[in-house]
Amino acid sequence: MGNGTEEDYNFVFKVVLIGESGVGKTNLLSRFTRNEFSHDSRTTIGVEFSTRTVMLGTAAVKAQIWDTAGLERYRAITSAYYRGAVGALLVFDLTKHQTYAVVERWLKELYDHAEATIVVMLVGNKSDLSQAREVPTEEARMFAENNGLLFLETSALDSTNVELAFETVLKEIFAKVSKQRQNSIRTNAITLGSAQAGQEPGPGEKRACCISL
């Protein structure tokens, strides 16, 4: 998966980061989009997002990654945060079992507000702190399998699997969009309009703000 330019892209995929406060969502975001990591644990209140354009085959995909930035502490996340999301990383801290114990609640909230076709990856973050592990890998992997989720363990600190996590989710979304587009072409059921899933803009056309699965 290569980098593209921010101005030149075929698709925009909105991906949301969800999970308890302090699990490392913001650092996963900054590591993927800017290759940065902050040891400052202070929480920023509000919703923020960063983007990174990557190449999937010959298609340029702009990943728009949204972070709750502390709002989860106050249960203040609204349906607007999930609207239009085609991917999600459900993050827990593998050194704090209580952050894993509530992933089912987060998953329910996600499915209550997002499309059923959303691509979801369960992410056990802070794998660099293996000595302090409280969540066995196989336990989390089994939960992911039983719920139809992708699964990886990551470390935003040392970058382990961060690229792979986002890349895997983006590739899965792209595969779904491509399949939907092919099916639409075969059935001659493409709806004209920039918001149609899988439709690439023509020359001079304004690019779609998001893709819906």
Curated annotation (Swiss-Prot):
Compartment(s) where it occurs, according to its Swiss-Prot or TrEMBL record: Cell membrane; Cytoplasmic vesicle; Cell projection, Pseudopodium membrane
Root EC class: hydrolase
Propeptide cleavage-removed residue intervals: 211-213
GO biological process terms on file: epithelial cell morphogenesis; exocytosis; positive regulation of cell population proliferation; positive regulation of epithelial cell migration; protein transport; pseudopodium organization; regulation of vesicle-mediated transport
InterPro entries, per database record: P-loop_NTPase, Rab_GTPases_membrane_traffic, Small_GTP-bd, Small_GTPase
Regulation: Regulated by guanine nucleotide exchange factors (GEFs) which promote the exchange of bound GDP for free GTP. Regulated by GTPase activating proteins (GAPs) which increase the GTP hydrolysis activity. Inhibited by GDP dissociation inhibitors (GDIs) which prevent Rab-GDP dissociation.
Catalytic reaction list: GTP + H2O = GDP + phosphate + H(+)
Motif (Switch 1): 35-49
Origin superkingdom: Eukaryota
Motif segment (Switch 2): 67-84
GO molecular function annotations of the record: G protein activity; GTP binding; GTPase activity; myosin V binding
Lipid-anchored residues (S-geranylgeranyl cysteine): 209-210
GO cellular component: cytoplasmic vesicle; extracellular exosome; Golgi apparatus; plasma membrane; pseudopodium; pseudopodium membrane; recycling endosome
Main location: membrane
Cofactor(s) the record lists: Mg(2+)
Subunit: Interacts (GTP-bound form) with RAB11FIP1, RAB11FIP2, RAB11FIP3 and RAB11FIP4. Interacts (via the hypervariable C-terminal region) with ITGB1 (via the cytoplasmic region); the interaction is GTP-dependent. Interacts with ITGAV. Associates with the integrin alpha-V/beta-1 heterodimer. Interacts with VPS33B.
Listed name of the protein: Ras-related protein Rab-25
Organism: Homo sapiens (Human)
Gene: RAB25
